[in-house]
């Protein structure tokens, strides 16, 4: 995949048309961080499970331990999504593993691997990361916001 393919603008209407059954996607030109935006929407009660925010550019992307993550405009896939897994509390620890496995499988053509706990590697080089924030909604419910930057 050439870099020119990554420069095409994201088409929010087309994305929603293709996946509208499960997800509601919002594409933004610029944000400080998709993760922060979605966390705030959840806190304000303005987000639903299945909401996704995709950005053309993040000015203050972040990783674990508040490390920064930055990529030039339209050169990276930057998104966060909100889920409410309907699983037993004992299963909540699997969320990061499932997210990492899913990313690696999606990028299998590039021989992607996950380096614990959240780095995405291809040819032994870091090409992205995964950031997961969980909040306990009740004794049996969890909210998860999963951010991915590639």
Q: Model features per residue range: what roles?
A:
Residues 50-52, 76-77, 113, 128-129, ...:
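Structural motif
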Residues 57-62, 120, 125, 143-145:
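Short glycine- and Lys/Arg-enriched binding-loop motifs that mark or flank ligand-binding interfaces
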Residues 99-139, 149:
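Acidic (Asp/Glu) carboxylate-rich active-site/surface patches
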Residues 80-82, 131, 147:
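Residue-level recognition of well-ordered beta-strand positions that form the cores
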Residues 71, 140-142:
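Short glycine/proline-enriched turns and hinge-like loops at secondary-structure junctions
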